[in-house]
Amino acid sequence: MLGMCRGRRKFVAASLALIFIPALTWLYLSSANITVKPLPLSPLDPQSSAVVGAAAEHQSLELRLRDVEEHNNALRREISRTPRVPTHSSHPSSSRHGNQLHTHSTEEGTGDSEAKKGAAAGNSSDCVPQPVVKKCETIHIAIVCAGYNASRDVVTLVKSVLFHRRNPLHFHIITDSIARKILADLFHTWMVPAVHVNFYDADELKSEVSWIPNKHYSGIHGLMKLVLTKTLPSDLEKVIVLDTDITFATDIAELWVVFHKFKGQQVLGLVENQSDWYLGNLWKNHRPWPALGRGFNTGVILLLLDRLRKLKWEQMWRLTAERELMSMLSTSLADQDIFNAVIKQNPFLVHQLPCYWNVQLSDHTRSEKCYKDVSDLKVIHWNSPKKLRVKNKHVEFFRNLYLTFLEYDGNLLRRELFGCPSETDHNSENLQKTLSELDEDDPCYEFRRERFTVHRTHVYFLHYEYEPTVDNTDVTLVAQLSMDRLQMLEAICKHWEGPISLALYLSDAEAQQFLRYAQGSEVLMSRSNVGYHIVYKEGQFYPVNLLRNVAMGQVNTPYMFLSDIDFLPMYGLYEYLRKSVVQLDMGNTKKALVVPAFETLRYRLSFPKSKAELLSQLDMGTLFTFRYHVWTKGHAPTDFAKWRTATTPYRVQWEADFEPYVMVRRESPEYDRRFVGFGWNKVAHIMELDAQEYEFVVLPNAYMIHMPHAPSFDITKFRSNKQYRACLKTLKEEFQQNMSRRYGFAALKYMTVDNNS
């Protein structure tokens, strides 16, 4: 009996071995993601298994696999009979993969860690679909911008947002009068589709926050985010608020969708402050405003405006500010201090954003803990007065990312979106209609098209501050230039002490080169009465007359001296022209005061300080009358022989191809935009002045000297390209016909004179 029991035990043990050993082996081999060397099917090592015959081994394996399959089927039937109890699995694979068979793998471990990261950031969800922004949903962005420097910063911010965006955008910009003028012109000429801009007067909001003492470098404008609920339209429900020193590295729609994650009474979306400022341990006796933990940074804010209004936000922040100012006396970080004080008292208001939505780069931040990889970056915040000079071990990477958008061609952002309906832009519609009417087979098509090209324009690129004199005699020098003429700026500033309006034709990258050049020049930085207006490059021609019109459009004095960048005016010309205004009764007559033009072929010239010195150099061959050897007709009517001995102003008559440099009233006609590049651009303007019955009066003691330079690209094309010259002639004839239609019978003389010549 004992022997029988032992025999049965051996039989059972053998049976179990035959069933479970192959089963475990099969499960091990069928693991999807762990690839290791397969175990032998018998306890023998590979050398001993080689002794077994191949046929017997194959048959044995087949039997074992069949047994394993039958065992698995039995298990499935048993499981199907067991009732399921719904539970919330904490395992990330449960929510991610539903009912899929999931094997343990290294991928699963990664998913688990990612889920933990998401939960820590407040972004975890169990089988809940992630919200998305609708294709054509408009994203609203609010920015406070004041002054010339902030206006430049806004452009870089907007570029980074436009580069990544896939949705229509609506910018709400709170500006002072300076920034409004700059940004209104910029957005108007930028013509980016599916972008709407509203401006709000910061001056009207000053009384709301001026009672708060503020030590922050942003000044009173740094407090205006507090009053957005009152400033922005009452029907606007939510908005993303951004500082001007922000750079986006992702689609802003990803941030917009976070609004869906707000719960309960959460109305503010903020990233935790990444410095120890609010911990009060940066230096001895440092006493910051109250904050929740490390506090929150207000460079990026998600505002639920409708809920804030219901919570009486205005009253809430005012009471908090008044209470804290009794002991703190002033804010150190502007609106951020007050936001944090409110949150300290009402922590339920805040929804904490993951820190990659506001990677703060200042000397005391620990922002490197927010990211391990480039893909982790969403928003970079240069929240230090040092900006790009801030200390950070990864600052070179961040700086390069910032410079990418700083120098990025903004014209490329004019791309159309994917069929989203938008309000009709009449300017864009009219432009497209005009361009469609042009004949693309016309040999002069590119010339004609250039006349209607809308160039992106950034007026007052640098700080400008000047009030015209009260006697109504003030004069602004007007000129235009490209990058290769920058070296003339300092010399002109030394010769002309009055206001200057300059239009610069530059690419985005060249504009930054110019900025660095100007900021490094003591001469240019000492002058606040020079307005620099950037017209961004587009097309193949130099839009010389557009540039002149842009510079003329920013003149705020009664008179303007229409010059060119290659000319140095005589010392004292500014005061001489102002005196001539009174002497010649310019305020009551239509006169164009002619300043005689000369030239030198020497790069180093002892500039004449008087008319006598100039005449001496003229006699010695150091100076010449301008273009005497290539274009005599251009300045011949000035009558240089008479000028040599003249002591009083004298009148001259218009002649064909006359193109003097003149001082006129600010209301004088603009230059005709059809003329681009080289040829007939000034001639046409002088012709129109004559048609409007301006008198040309030569000033006896005024002069200007043209300095030598390499030939421009456009004059080279004019000289070498026959089609260029043919198109210029065609445009000239069309201009003359247009003059006849506008000014009647008297204007026929321009066509007659030209035909005779």
UniProtKB/Swiss-Prot annotation:
Membrane topology category: Single-pass type II membrane protein
Sorted UniProt keywords: Coiled coil, Glycoprotein, Glycosyltransferase, Golgi apparatus, Manganese, Membrane, Metal-binding, Multifunctional enzyme, Signal-anchor, Transferase, Transmembrane, Transmembrane helix
Domain of life: Eukaryota
Protein's pathway: Protein modification; protein glycosylation
Record EC number: 2.4.-.-, 2.4.2.-, 2.4.1.-
Subcellular location: Golgi apparatus membrane
Class in the EC hierarchy, top level: transferase
Molecular function GO labels: glucuronosyltransferase activity; hexosyltransferase activity; manganese ion binding; xylosyltransferase activity
Residue span of region Xylosyltransferase activity: 139-414
Co-factor remark: Binds 2 Mn(2+) ions per subunit. The xylosyltransferase part binds one Mn(2+) and the beta-1,3-glucuronyltransferase part binds one Mn(2+).
Cofactor list: Mn(2+)
CC per GO annotation: Golgi apparatus; Golgi membrane
Keyword Lyase in record: no
Binding annotation for Mn(2+) 1: D243, D245
Annotated transmembrane regions: 11-31
Protein's job: Bifunctional glycosyltransferase with both alpha-1,3-xylosyltransferase and beta-1,3-glucuronyltransferase activities involved in the maturation of alpha-dystroglycan (DAG1) by glycosylation leading to DAG1 binding to laminin G-like domain-containing extracellular proteins with high affinity. Elongates the glucuronyl-beta-1,4-xylose-beta disaccharide primer structure initiated by B4GAT1 by adding repeating units [-3-Xylose-alpha-1,3-GlcA-beta-1-] to produce a heteropolysaccharide.
Protein name per Swiss-Prot or TrEMBL: Xylosyl- and glucuronyltransferase LARGE1
Organism encoding this protein: Danio rerio
Gene: large1
